[in-house]
From Swiss-Prot:
Disulfide bonds: none annotated. The gene is POLR2B. This is DNA-directed RNA polymerase II subunit RPB2. The lineage of its organism: Eukaryota, Metazoa, Chordata, Craniata, Vertebrata. GO terms for biological process: transcription by RNA polymerase II. PROSITE patterns: RNA_POL_BETA. Its EC number is 2.7.7.6, 3.1.13.-, 2.7.7.48. RNA binds at residues 731, 841, 890, 942.
Amino acid sequence: MYDADEDMQYDEDDDEITPDLWQEACWIVISSYFDEKGLVRQQLDSFDEFIQMSVQRIVEDAPPIDLQAEAQHASGEVEEPPRYLLKFEQIYLSKPTHWERDGAPSPMMPNEARLRNLTYSAPLYVDITKTVIKEGEEQLQTQHQKTFIGKIPIMLRSTYCLLNGLTDRDLCELNECPLDPGGYFIINGSEKVLIAQEKMATNTVYVFAKKDSKYAYTGECRSCLENSSRPTSTIWVSMLARGGQGAKKSAIGQRIVATLPYIKQEVPIIIVFRALGFVSDRDILEHIIYDFEDPEMMEMVKPSLDEAFVIQEQNVALNFIGSRGAKPGVTKEKRIKYAKEVLQKEMLPHVGVSDFCETKKAYFLGYMVHRLLLAALGRRELDDRDHYGNKRLDLAGPLLAFLFRGMFKNLLKEVRIYAQKFIDRGKDFNLELAIKTRIISDGLKYSLATGNWGDQKKAHQARAGVSQVLNRLTFASTLSHLRRLNSPIGRDGKLAKPRQLHNTLWGMVCPAETPEGHAVGLVKNLALMAYISVGSQPSPILEFLEEWSMENLEEISPAAIADATKIFVNGCWVGIHKDPEQLMNTLRKLRRQMDIIVSEVSMIRDIREREIRIYTDAGRICRPLLIVEKQKLLLKKRHIDQLKEREYNNYSWQDLVASGVVEYIDTLEEETVMLAMTPDDLQEKEVAYCSTYTHCEIHPSMILGVCASIIPFPDHNQSPRNTYQSAMGKQAMGVYITNFHVRMDTLAHVLYYPQKPLVTTRSMEYLRFRELPAGINSIVAIASYTGYNQEDSVIMNRSAVDRGFFRSVFYRSYKEQESKKGFDQEEVFEKPTRETCQGMRHAIYDKLDDDGLIAPGVRVSGDDVIIGKTVTLPENEDELEGTNRRYTKRDCSTFLRTSETGIVDQVMVTLNQEGYKFCKIRVRSVRIPQIGDKFASRHGQKGTCGIQYRQEDMPFTCEGITPDIIINPHAIPSRMTIGHLIECLQGKVSANKGEIGDATPFNDAVNVQKISNLLSDYGYHLRGNEVLYNGFTGRKITSQIFIGPTYYQRLKHMVDDKIHSRARGPIQILNRQPMEGRSRDGGLRFGEMERDCQIAHGAAQFLRERLFEASDPYQVHVCNLCGIMAIANTRTHTYECRGCRNKTQISLVRMPYACKLLFQELMSMSIAPRMMSV
């Protein structure tokens, strides 16, 4: 790798990295990783794979469209009509483009798409070859170059995005934030993320024990062809439980049966083998039990052999299977043909769907039975459903490929239908008109916009929530949303197993960041250095194995399997090998040199089971580890020195991987390596814990995800506290992105004076938390001063708040567009006038300009009009001509939210996709911290503001420092957030020392003792306690108080957004009860439990007032004779009950309107509730 003279400069021992050096060196390695990969690389790579490979593959895989008209029998002799063949070939994708209404294309910039509610998508073109074959003439080929077939939404910052590869300066000129990571789509102006979906790995054999079922054990294999549109077909091989439901319990032991796709009943396993053409018992057993010297296993198979004794020929077996699958009443030949089809095409398609795959399928089926028997005999552990090696994650690539495949199929179907019409009339057809470009464009747009993943027509089968609106509250919440994983298990299931933190998640998934409540443990987040494979072709590996003396299944004698090692590639058994040790070494060497084998391929050698499994598929989660050989890191000082200079010498992370110093290890392979936690473990010790290390962690703090990496000293907190902070960190206010002033987000909170924390973790620099922080370093005292901070509330310094402490601004955008609803109904922006407009509200319309929009800088308050819009009323035919109507228009303006006030910040008028006038208005309001607002430290210690005291009323130290925030001492003991206290100490040291404190987890260099000693060097109390003086009296407070700087966050939950009360107001139409919810000025529900309390109190009048007078009072007239509601005309005072012919005996009854409604609904179902008045 290096020249000889270069090697000479570095003495071998001198080049080793010592543990002390590693403290800094590991962060250089990690920085190089993030410089190259960023935080959303897994999204971008997956999308690029889709665009560059999958789309072309899907188009090529589609069979050519073959069309021919029906033969015409008009002229006597039958002439063969011409055949038309359409083949789709090379595809082209252009850069994202927008066609204005006048038809001029222009490149579309992402920010323009956001502001104008466009979709950021690129046009897709394809070459089509059209061949016309007429009898007696030579065929005529026409090439249709670059035919437009639809638009594909483009992921921001991917290869085909216009922002790809631009410098920070260029990005700023395009109004884009250089820190924005990309990895999302823009659909109709809103940003959408594709959440990675978890699924079980396909083509792998699992064996599970069945509880409470007729089977004791089941082996399953979800078989699926690589890159194919066919759905997965699962095959189950099960062993019946002892003493099953069968009648003859004693006669036959535990039989083994298979459940085949499209076959209704289960089929005895031996019959399946005979149907595959393996007839003699010995042949079959050779494929199941490789070693005949194993009496236990032979016994297990005996019952199955006895059961299938009646069927000895292949055709009889096929007939047996066919009669259980085909429609009843078809001939024997048809049944046999059907069974052959099922066995060839539907059973284990990943082994092969062509002819002559019987041997391979028999071997694979035999392997499944073998695994089942091993599990039944207790020689091999059962598989674990929650093991992360058995899981795959579907990212943007596979998800979009699944969608595009369906859309493309529909497109071809439409082309065929369109062309057939013309051909049947004997005409030629126009290809451009035959292609409905809307199918692909709208199909992809629909799924990305709604999150229903699948065909729009079958919306109920589709998965929901795959695509979500990108969370833009804080920068951390955006990053975290782009790295989220979702398990599609029903949220209502109370299953604990899939929600638990599994051992295999170490380093792949963050242990702290998961939501609380019903989705806990089902929604996860990627750890910082985890990466998801995009998949590569297995063909080079298969060719390599052929060369390296792997014996193919077709060519071996079954006896050879017993002592050889089986080789699986992507779950498919491809052959056996006699020297696995050497083979694995060669494969590893190739992967480390990145020769033939891509670095993300994983190879597992299971020594005990004699198997080598190689995986190249997409969606495996993996992470980089340092390679150790002979107890020494392969990473040397020279690599570190080159990385330090990486701005100048272009030496990057990729070079580390290429030089075989670092490699990617996935969850399955991680179980076969020996991992050292730190290079310190590799040092020669008296008693070595292990002398066979193969890999070493880069840094243990990389097991955390985005939100947990912001927590200082998370290893000193009780674990649920870290989980709480991970959720709250997403609600903190800060600067969510640097171009917020040119964006029109529906909601946005921006803190006035955010500060970077005094106490940071090393991981923060990769999350850009220093550039875009979300909080303020506040002086925090822990005391119960005046007692206004009980129950998690905090006392705040009023003077600090007046100086701008935690002040924030809140932006809300309103949007509206003109449109034509019909030929006589059109909407226009204008200032409505009371003379011509119907339905104008009692609101102030004077603030509008003549164009119907409000001007920037105007102060607006609840229910003011911000966008004036009218819609023309349709003319009524029955009106006489000449009579001019009073109203010609109806008002449909947009009003400010009732509970908000603010200043109009920005008004934007433009044209949208359809060319209609379209406007967005942004209103800003200043939010000053007040009593009831929510704050939190970075340790899950949340609290609301209980009271604000002026600075002169706050306690002060002898140096004259007053705290900004006072929290209650009771918040600490039971919650055990020691990290909070250490952060405060470290912050005190940092403020004195003038440098940033390091609070990275699992860091032995920093501990409480060291921080305390530093603090006492500066003349403070060892543990941060100080003497405080009472602000009211000036006397010394008897106890010492813990005080120091702590980083606090302001959360988005503010009193102004929650305060709500109502006296009278709008009611629902159906039951005349008050509306629900603050936005509709609704009432407060007096529920069942409140009602029960009042009944227990015996407060009857109060109860009546709440549930009747204050809700929906109503009066009805009731006939005294039959008790049914009577007809009453209150104007003429005439009352009658038609049924009883009674006009006199009628009473007035008061009852809730909802009760009257119920009675009438019952009457409609011919149940008569009679109200007998007494």
